Amino acid sequence: MRLKQVTPWFCLRRIPELGGIWNPWSGGAYRNACMQNSRYTFHYTGFPPGDIDEFPGVEQVFRYLSAVAGEDALRESTRLNTEVVSLRKDAGHWVIRCASEGKDTEDIFDRVIIATGELWQPRRPPLPGEENFSGTLITSRDYQEPEAFKGKNILIIGGGVSGADIASDLVPFARSVSLSVKKMGLYLPRQFPTGPNDMMHSYLGRCLLSQMNYEDFIGYLDTMMPDYMQAYRASGLLPDMANNNAVHVNEKIIPNVAAGLIKVKPLAERFTGEGAIKFVDASQEKYDVIITCTGYEMPDYSFIQGFDRTQLYEHFFWTEDPSLAVINPPVDTAGFGAAFPYFDIISQWVMNVFSGKTSLPEKEAMRKWCAEHMASLHVKRFYDSWLETIRIGLLSGLLPEPARDFSRYWNIISSIVKPAYLATPPAFPEHGMMDSLFDFRIARIRILSGLGNDALGYLLKKGDITDAEYRAALEIDPRQSISVHLPYSQTSL
């Protein structure tokens, strides 16, 4: 064991290369996976991707992340093949014990960020009688390429995006593909007739979409994508009710089911004595391969001495000692939206807190937030990463304050979700292709109405709003106001 002096900063990684699950050799994303977000929206705020496919695949995302690391000279300060064994606070400093190549070392730091990710330890659904199954039983984490399953009868368990992706990936090679689901959410394609799915709405458009009647939304989709929606109804999978914002992105699963290429089965219950799967409707079938796609376990923080995950303010700052931050997805959320710009703005917030540029609330206020929001970590909820980016950007002071700089704030939220606009608001709003569904003029007044009389007076004097907008905002029923944070439904149906 050797003890090092305090160092400026290091990045410690367990695997031998950068890129996380997008590293083709990490065993993370399977070979044919591609981004659910387009090249226009998926990237970090200050690092556009250049000339890549509209929806980049594993190799392209890996090259992009490698370029980001090279740009920031991250490689020189990164220790690969290094496992963090323990983390403890001692004499005002964080002591990190690591293991690498058979050696243990300790390093001392003033501040620590945990960014381990969540897509590493897959959940396995309980299937009694597994010992009777003589075929191949793997998880989505083990799946890499469809050719290995040529000519097999395959059952996929799980109705999420991974299940839909892998089932569709297998169709050209397997003898048969079945998909066992408890329920399925709303599946829409990456590409709409008018452009990429994620270019359809601005941030404000997404907020208003959350409030839209589901039947009206489906009616609009019928008009926009009649062939797709006809196949959706033929598949029998169109939900009777869904969260409009909680979209599952996959353009193959619905046409494949409608064409009979994927057979939908109810929830798998157990194995029979003969090794067949018995479903909850009492039907039974035998399979050569079963692939479970039922999510991932919560990240394991047991290596942090004295840590309590329920005391993470806003899911990121440890209330008992905010010199420790966790930049991982909030646990048990069904997220939708671009992860990179979302984590980008959280990272900026963390660094501003660490540097003293930004302050967090008092400890008691943070504990109160945790008591209200972190008590039920296993309750599944929808998490709109785009709208959370706006909320966190305002909370952290990284986006223009609406009460003082409404014009720049408005130009961000009423524009499509391009990451560059978070750093430099456009001179004029760039609306999404489906924003015409909503009356932004009225929405603007509803947002202004929640700012209060003093802020409205200031904005009028500054010239950010007109006299007509000022008067209209004063007349709005407070119950009709829209928060500047752009709230949305977190119900996961």
Predicted regions and their residues:
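Rossmann-like dinucleotide-binding core of oxidoreductases
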Residues: M1-W22, S66, K103-D107, V112-H248, ...
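FAD-binding beta-loop-beta segment adjacent to the flavin cofactor pocket
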Residues: P24-N37, L127-E131, V280, Y296-V326, ...
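N-terminal glycine-rich dinucleotide-binding loop that anchors FAD/FMN and/or NAD(P) in oxidoreductases
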Residues: S26-G50, N197-M212
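Helix-loop-beta segment of a Rossmann-like dinucleotide-binding subdomain
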Residues: H43-G57, V95, K150, R233-N244
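Feature captures the FAD/FMN-dependent oxidoreductase FAD-binding
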Residues: E54-Q121, N256-V257, R270-G275
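FAD-site-proximal beta/loop scaffold in flavoenzymes
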Residues: T136, S140-E145, G275-F279, E285-Y287, ...
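C-terminal, flexible cofactor-proximal segment of oxidoreductases
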Residues: L186-P189, A325-L493
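Alpha/beta-hydrolase fold catalytic core
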Residues: Y228-K286, I290-Y296, N453-G457, K462-S489
